[in-house]
Curated annotation (Swiss-Prot):
Excises uracil residues from the DNA which can arise as a result of misincorporation of dUMP residues by DNA polymerase or due to deamination of cytosine. One of its GO terms (cellular component) is cytoplasm. GO terms for biological process: base-excision repair, AP site formation via deaminated base removal. It is found in: Cytoplasm. Its EC number is 3.2.2.27. The lineage of its organism: Bacteria, Bacillati, Bacillota, Bacilli, Lactobacillales. InterPro entries: UDG_fam1 (IPR002043), Ura-DNA_Glyclase_AS (IPR018085), Uracil-DNA_glycosylase-like (IPR005122), Uracil-DNA_glycosylase-like_sf (IPR036895). PANTHER family: URACIL-DNA GLYCOSYLASE. GO terms for molecular function: uracil DNA N-glycosylase activity. Coiled coil: none annotated. Keywords: Cytoplasm, DNA damage, DNA repair, Hydrolase. This is Uracil-DNA glycosylase. It holds the Pfam family UDG.
Length: 217
């Protein structure tokens, strides 16, 4: 990410020592035990979806905390790994909305301009949200604010109460916010199923003369 537009813009909006503090934090936690994703994949969302290509932002909370799952993209796992419950429900809603997708790896979405961002970018094994509130939120809030500052229209997909709190950062009237309950089994039946975020997103992109996302790719 170091030479990307994201890095340059984020650096401008955070304190001068912030990236040094991130590196200190990472040195510490990765030396203490198993942390996900692999260190080289922490910023994968930003490297796979350059600022210039951003069309959609899907916000997650923190990485999957089981072995082999997290790959630096919110909600995504490698195809060789069983889909976690939230991803199962995302694919179920996609199937009802647009069509069936067999892949669990969402990298192809990222390459089309879908920023798959977690608010917290690291997690210790089997300890969900353990790194929340420690270092990452100023960084990922800056990413959301930079997405909001884009001149071209962006679709923000916010699932669940945690993500919806970030709506306060989305003030540009050019953008579209799609919000619903979280795809987790605990809440999917309270407004996620039937919300049709994928077709709504593509309709908005087409209205704005932007290439729609091939969600089935």
């Amino acid at each position: 990410m170091e030479h990307s537009t994201w890095h340059r813009k984020i650096k401008e909006s955070l304190p001068p020592d912030y990236f040094a503090r991130i590196n200190q934090f990472l040195d510490q936690v990765y030396s203490q035990g198993r942390v996900y994703p692999k260190r080289e994949h922490i910023f994968k969302a930003l490297t796979e979806t350059p600022y210039e290509d951003l069309k959609v932002l899907i916000l997650g909370q923190d990485p999957y905390h089981g072995p082999g799952q997290a790959q630096g993209l919110s909600f995504s796992v490698p195809d060789s790994i069983a889909a976690p419950p939230s991803l199962q429900n995302i694919l179920k809603e996609l199937s009802e909305d647009i069509g069936k997708r067999d892949h669990h790896d969402l990298t192809s979405w990222a390459k089309q301009g879908v920023l798959l961002l977690n608010a917290c970018l690291t997690v210790p094994e089997h300890q969900a949200n353990a790194h929340a509130g420690l270092i990452w939120e100023p960084f990922t809030d800056a990413v959301i604010q930079l997405a909001n500052a884009k001149e071209s229209p962006v679709v923000f997909i916010l699932w669940g109460g945690f993500a919806r709190k970030k709506k306060a950062f989305i003030t540009n009237p050019k953008h579209l916010v799609i919000e619903s309950a979280h795809p987790s089994p605990l809440s999917a039946y309270r407004g996620f199923f039937g919300s049709r975020p994928f077709s709504k997103c593509n309709a908005f992109l087409k209205e704005n003369q932007l290439e729609p996302i091939d969600w089935l790719q």
